[in-house]
Amino acid sequence: MALTLASAADLLKEHHLLREIIQGDVWTDDPARIASADEPFAGITYDTRKVTPGTLLCCKGQFKAEYLNGIDEAGLAAYVAETEYSAATATPGLIVNDARKAMSLLSAAFYGYPQNELTVIGVTGTKGKTTTSYFTQALINAVSGGKVALFSSVDNCLDGHTYVESDLTTPESMDAFRMMREAADNGMKYLVMEVSSQAYKVDRVYGLTFDVAAFLNISPDHISPIEHPTFEDYLYCKRQIIVNAKSLVLGADSLHADLLREDAEAAGIGVTTFALHDADNAGTSADVVAWPADPAHASFHIADGDQALGDYHLSIDGDFNYLNAAAAIAIAHAVGVSLDDADALHAIESVRIAGRMEQFRDPQSNTLAIVDYAHNYASVTALLDFVYERWGEENPRITLVTGSAGNKAYDRRKEIVEAAENRIANFIFTAEDTDTEPIIDICMEMQGYITNKDVVSTVISDRLTAITNAIYDARAHADRFNILLIIGKGNERWIKDHRKHVPFDGDDHVVERMFGL
């Protein structure tokens, strides 16, 4: 059924969001008093630049009346806002208590509730969301004939095989429902999507129920005035995925796992667990368990409780990815994939993710460069654990090329240094989505957290120059095995500076070019 002003008003009333409808001198809660109430909207947007005849505009965030200049001439049909804009437009306004919640509900309705045509899987956690999502897509693709869409912080895939770079970990609600509609129209039957804490903080997934929610892990992150004021708030927002799910897949060793189980019990949903054991298969009991077989070749065992399911080899290095694989297998099982389906389980073996644990060897020196998206204490620690387990006996000289995001997650700056300073030889601090903060200020702040007098540190604001210098420095120490850890950006082809995406080659391309690969 097409969305009209009348049906929009009814939907908003149902969720106790509508305050009144205003058009000129008419203030009412009865849409029948608005002449155009039964005319279907031709489009929906939150960007005034995209208004065309018949469009419903959702005014969210820091919206300003000046954005409405000339909007009636563009064909605006109605608007949704927390403030009336009668002085700027003659069109009717749906005045609401919460514009973001309203936008999510109205977007779902406008696009015909596409989530009802998909099995929707939400993946959350502090680390591992992207890799787990890609593994999950591959597993379910193997049994569904490639019918799995993907929303991730790296790419979006709406047809099972074409990947387009994404802007947000979890898209704005309107974009999410639009893409769900496209995916459903493309014949997709499943959707795997990363769900960030901010998605619940700012209602990007309001009204969306997940068929399966996966809660991988939790550790302090995203603590800042513009994200989460405390860890409690961060965890609380993450936990909302459980309240809005039909079943839960849970990391058995996650911090606060007992609380998460309590949430699931209160919601009346079942729980499937996964865990990573040590090489002797000792660890927390779980429904799906992974443990190392041959770490040098990224091989691991998988078991369904006590029943062995076979050995598998990943194309992505890192013991922590065995845990991500176990999570994906548990998720796939939760949506009906048989754990006896060896072909499906083997589908994870060919998965590669640009900018995640990518390794490059320099033909001119004994240097290994690893490009990864590690950007907080947990992920940097996991990366260094992997490096030491794999190459520790070779006594490598390790250089970390890093920065930290501007205007948010301020604790990361100190935590990255704390995770690395006693395990590496050299820091190079550089740009990483510094936004409106001066690059040099962030780098100098991070440098100031170093307490190990033996570690060398350099500040090089330009990221291209920083990576280039790291490679030249490694070649100058050719008598040692050098490992360059270039983290924070992965394969992203831009750096955020003053709210704009400035084109950048990408860490992987810079390394490939310097190494002549």
Question: For each of these PLM feature ranges, what is it?
Answer:
Residues 14, 105-248, 252, 256-270:
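Phosphate-binding loop of NTP-binding sites
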